[in-house]
Structure formats: structure tokens, C-alpha cells
Amino acid sequence: MKVLWAALLVTFLAGCQAAADAPIKVEQPVEPETEPELRPQTEWQSGQPWELALGRFWDYLRWVQTLSEQVQEELLSPQVTQELTTLMDETMKELKAYKSELEEQLSPVAEETRARLSKELQAAQARLGADMEDVRSRLVQYRSEVQAMLGQSTEELRARLASHLRKLRKRLLRDADDLQKRLAVYQAGAREGAERGVSAIRERLGPLVEQGRVRAATVGSLASQPLQERAQALGERLRARMEEMGSRTRDRLDEVKEQVAEVRAKLEEQAQQISLQAEAFQARLKSWFEPLVEDMQRQWAGLVEKVQAAVGASTAPVPSDNH
């Protein structure tokens, strides 16, 4: 299918667009005869993306219009309508993008003119979209009718479809012509608006250019002064700046020294306070535990004396009973 599209696109770009179909023989599907030229496609084809997309849709419609055996087989499946839907969406997308681009160029044009042109272009765009949708609907209807008449003769349906497609192709050609003309008007308006915008910019830039000339003349007069005088003035300014910075640096160093001395004094004072608090706490602990230690020593001494007395009593000699 892609190879066939490429061949049809080459024919499309060469300007070999035909508008009328040759009659189809009802005995059996055959390749159509060469169609007479209705209008050379190059008259409205300018290479815009939307026109190229419309050309692909056009060539695909020509291929469908042949009603060859391959077309007959694919018309019974949704592939053809899906391809047409894709080509329709692509065409309308490119057309909307081109329209948006022209609308940006129309910004300097009067609002009333821009609204009128946009309304006319939208109407032509809607007609083209409706006719493309009509083509797709006809093919869907044909597929449904053929499927309903399986096993019966479909020659009348094919002849009727061929007639409808010829009419739709003529309508599409008229829509494309109308759309191309309105886009040309749209583009002319955009070009005129752009020229007005350039004139307005030139008027605004005039004073700025004059100011630039005055400034350049001032710079030129300064450049004519002796180089030694300018260097001396620059040296004086640098010297004054360095002296000012040195004075500020010395003042800042003095402030830092004073702050460091204050911090050192505070740290020494806090260290002394901590030392005194530690000595007081040590004395307090000593006063707490000394009575307890003395009491424990007394109790221990008494316990030792009692043990010694008990041991001495148990070792004393027992008197004998010999008389």
C-alpha cells in the first residue's frame, strides 16, 4: 500500500491531476481508462503542508475510485476508511497549523479585518472537512450495502458509488480552490500588516538611532582628550578608592580585636565560676559522707570487739569434777 501511495504522490506533484473518471464496465472490475484533465493541479498547488496532505487524500481517493479487485477486497474491511480518516485528520491538522501561522502574522492588521478574514477561512475549511467526511461516509455505506448483498450482484452499487465519488471529487476541487484563494487573501493581509509593523518599528527606532549618534559623538570627543590626562584622572580615582578601602579594613580589624577580647574575658570569667562551683560541690559531698563513714567505722569496731569477746569465752578452760 505504501508503494502505491508513493507512486500516486509522484503523479500528484507532477501536476497530473485528473478530475473525471472513465466509465466502469459492469461485466467485471477492470482498470479505469485515463481520465481527462479537469484542471491542472499546479494552479492551486503551492507546496504548503496542508496542500500536500490534501494531495495524499486526493490520490488515495483516485485509487479507491478505480474499484479494482484490490480495492473491492479492501472496501469490505475497515482499512480504507481508516486510511481516509488518517489522511483527513492530517490534512485538517496541517491546515489549522498554517492558519495559526497566518493569524500570528496578521497581528498588526485591524481587528475587524482580521475577524472577517478568519470567519471566511473557517467557513471554507469547514466545507472542505465536510466534503472529506462525506467521502468517508459514502465508502462506509457502500461497504455495509455490499456486505448485506453477499452472493448477489453489486454492479449497481459500484456504478452508484463511482458516480458519487466523481461528484465528491469535483466538490473537493472547488473547496480546495476556494480555500487556496482565501488563504492567499489572508496571506496578503498578513504581508500588509507586517509592512505596517516594520514602518511602526522604524518610526520608534528613529529617536533611538539619533540618541546613539549623539552618544557616539560624545564618546568621540572624550577620545580626543590627551591620554595622559585621562590616565592621571583614573590613577587619582583608584588611589582614593584604595585609601578608602584601607581605612575601612583597619576599622574592621579594630572591631574584630575588641570583640575577641570581650569573648576571652567572658570565657575566663565562666571558667573561674565553674571552678568555684566544683570546689563547693566537692566540699558538700565531703560533708555528706564523712559522718556516714565515721558511723560505719564505730559500728565495725563494736562488731569486732563483740566477736573477739565471744571467741575468748569459748576458749576458756572448763573446771574438772575430781574430788
UniProtKB/Swiss-Prot annotation:
Sites of Phosphoserine modification: 153
Signal sequence annotation: 1-18
Main location (coarse class): secreted
Stretches forming Sequence repeats: 86-107, 108-129, 130-151, 152-173, 174-195, 196-217, 218-239, 240-261
Gene Ontology MF annotations: cholesterol transfer activity; heparan sulfate proteoglycan binding; heparin binding; identical protein binding; low-density lipoprotein particle receptor binding; phosphatidylcholine-sterol O-acyltransferase activator activity; phospholipid binding
Protein origin, superkingdom: Eukaryota
Glycan-bearing residues: 218
Positions of the UniProt region annotated as LDL and other lipoprotein receptors binding: 164-174
Residues annotated with Methionine sulfoxide modification: 149
Residues where heparin binds: 168-171, 235-242
InterPro entries attached to this UniProt entry: ApoA_E, Apolipoprotein_A1/A4/E
Region (Specificity for association with VLDL): 284-296
Localization terms from the record: Secreted; Secreted, Extracellular space; Secreted, Extracellular space, Extracellular matrix; Extracellular vesicle
Region (Homooligomerization): 272-323
Record's keyword annotation contains Aminoacyl-tRNA synthetase: no
GO cellular component: chylomicron; extracellular exosome; extracellular matrix; extracellular space; high-density lipoprotein particle; intermediate-density lipoprotein particle; low-density lipoprotein particle; multivesicular body, internal vesicle
UniProt keyword annotations, A-Z: Chylomicron, Endosome, Extracellular matrix, Glycoprotein, HDL, Heparin-binding, Lipid transport, Lipid-binding, Oxidation, Phosphoprotein, Repeat, Secreted, Signal, Transport, VLDL
Biological processes annotated in GO: acylglycerol homeostasis; cholesterol efflux; cholesterol metabolic process; chylomicron remnant clearance; high-density lipoprotein particle assembly; intermediate-density lipoprotein particle clearance; lipoprotein biosynthetic process; melanosome organization
Annotated stretches, region: 8 X 22 AA approximate tandem repeats: 86-261
Name of one Pfam family that matches: Apolipoprotein
Quaternary structure (record): Homotetramer. May interact with ABCA1; functionally associated with ABCA1 in the biogenesis of HDLs. May interact with APP/A4 amyloid-beta peptide; the interaction is extremely stable in vitro but its physiological significance is unclear. May interact with MAPT. May interact with MAP2. In the cerebrospinal fluid, interacts with secreted SORL1. Interacts with PMEL; this allows the loading of PMEL luminal fragment on ILVs to induce fibril nucleation.
Family note: Belongs to the apolipoprotein A1/A4/E family.
Its biological purpose: APOE is an apolipoprotein, a protein associating with lipid particles, that mainly functions in lipoprotein-mediated lipid transport between organs via the plasma and interstitial fluids. APOE is a core component of plasma lipoproteins and is involved in their production, conversion and clearance. Apolipoproteins are amphipathic molecules that interact both with lipids of the lipoprotein particle core and the aqueous environment of the plasma.
PANTHER family attached to this UniProt entry: APOLIPOPROTEIN (PTHR18976), APOLIPOPROTEIN E (PTHR18976:SF2)
Protein name: Apolipoprotein E
Organism of provenance: Chlorocebus sabaeus (Green monkey)
